[in-house]
UniProtKB/Swiss-Prot annotation:
This is Protein pelota homolog. GO terms for biological process: nonfunctional rRNA decay; nuclear-transcribed mRNA catabolic process, no-go decay; nuclear-transcribed mRNA catabolic process, non-stop decay; ribosome disassembly; RNA surveillance. The keyword Ribonucleoprotein does not apply. SMART domains: eRF1_1 (SM01194). Pfam families: eRF1_1 (PF03463), eRF1_2 (PF03464), eRF1_3 (PF03465). It comes from Methanopyrus kandleri (strain AV19 / DSM 6324 / JCM 9639 / NBRC 100938). It is an enzyme of class 3 (hydrolase).
Length: 353
């Protein structure tokens, strides 16, 4: 989760949820009586319209402040539904539902922020890894870090590479790649970068991404842009490259843990649990290292109030376990669903029976 703006003296925090986990955190933070602001599309009537014809209004973007009456999870989509009455904006006094999805900013205003709510937002924010963007073209590389306040260009690498007919072109390109890779490794270590996106025009970006993977064992996501330099970095951000890189890495992490789950099941290892009853028991013992919950199972639990699933998540969080809401859009998520929609890797085995 990204904290966009925070002013506790004025009682508000503006956030940008980036994953389903972030929606889970917000579900526990937003409560009845809070005031939530969001940019919504709402039908606005034209008061100047002729009275002879009925004006149904046109849907326009409006910034609304809604006094919360209820918060629920949409059963058929990965989104929160925040229901309430409009206090700020057109048609004050009308009921409205703010649908919160990943990538949608909301401002939460409370009379008083409880410590547990601040800690939950801080926890969600800390789980947001830094992303490095690299715009590359022949002999020119620009490196940027995506920070909370925006893009920070941290390095530029230039190297004289001969034209296509130059005899030393290939050798000089390799020298350039090595120099750029050295900078990437140095900055990634300093910044704690987990995701790298390489973009640029032409084929150089793909060649460099392959070089990083084969020569330096550094995985990178590739994005096509119309330009290199800082303009290329900005273009990557506008095209949603950061969000895609984080999501792809998240799926890779889910797959890694699920592979380990099935590996332990196959070996008869007792440091694994699956199914609601077993996972709840493991959570109560404080034995869970990683808890994996299928997104469909999680939605159903929130909508239908399936306490065993919600308690397994709550107890796992309290004991420092990593909790992942797993997409069932990929094969391994489907396999998790076959295990009852919930599984856990354990720190230690728990008593049976």
């Amino acid at each position: 989760m990204k904290v966009v703006e925070k002013d506790l003296d004025k009682g508000y925090i503006e956030v940008l949820p980036e994953t389903l986990d972030d929606l889970w955190h917000l579900y526990h933070v937003v409560r009845k009586g809070d005031l939530v602001f969001a940019l919504e599309r709402r039908r606005v009537k034209d008061e100047r319209a002729e009275t002879i014809r009925r004006d149904k209004g046109e849907r326009k973007p409006v910034y609304l402040g809604v006094r919360v009456e209820d918060v629920e999870f949409d059963k058929y989509a990965n989104r929160l539904r925040i229901k309430g009455v409009i206090e700020h904006g057109p048609e004050s006094g009308s009921h409205h539902t703010v649908n919160v999805t990943t990538g949608k900013r909301i401002k939460i205003v409370k009379d008083e922020w409880e410590r547990k709510d601040l800690e939950r937002i801080e926890e969600a924010e800390m789980s947001r890894p830094p992303v490095m963007l690299v715009a590359v073209d022949t002999g020119e590389g620009t490196i940027g870090i995506v920070r909370d306040y925006g893009l920070d260009v941290v390095a530029r690498v230039r190297h004289n590479v001969p034209g296509k007919r130059g005899g030393d072109r290939r050798a000089e390109m390799r020298k350039f790649f090595h120099r750029l890779a050295d900078e990437i490794e140095r900055i990634a270590e300093e910044e704690g970068v987990e995701h790298i996106v390489v973009g640029g025009p032409g084929f150089v970006k793909s060649d460099f991404a392959e070089f990083l993977r084969e020569e330096r064992d550094i995985p990178a996501h590739v994005e096509d842009t119309g330009s290199a330099g800082e303009a290329g970095l900005i273009e990557m951000i506008r095209r949603g490259a950061v969000e895609r890189a984080v999501e792809e890495s998240r799926v890779a992490e889910e797959v890694k843990h699920l592979e380990e789950v099935f590996k332990r099941i196959g070996k008869g290892d007792d440091k694994v649990a699956y199914g609601v009853r077993e996972c709840l028991k493991a959570a109560e013992f404080g034995a869970i290292d990683v808890l994996l919950v299928a997104d469909e199972k999680f939605r159903e639990a929130m909508v239908e109030g399936e306490e065993d699933v919600l308690n397994a998540v709550k107890y796992a969080e309290r004991t420092g376990a990593e909790v992942l809401i797993v997409s069932t859009e990929h094969e391994w998520g489907e396999r998790l669903r076959e295990l009852g929609g919930i599984a856990a890797l354990l720190r230690f085995s728990i008593p049976t029976g």
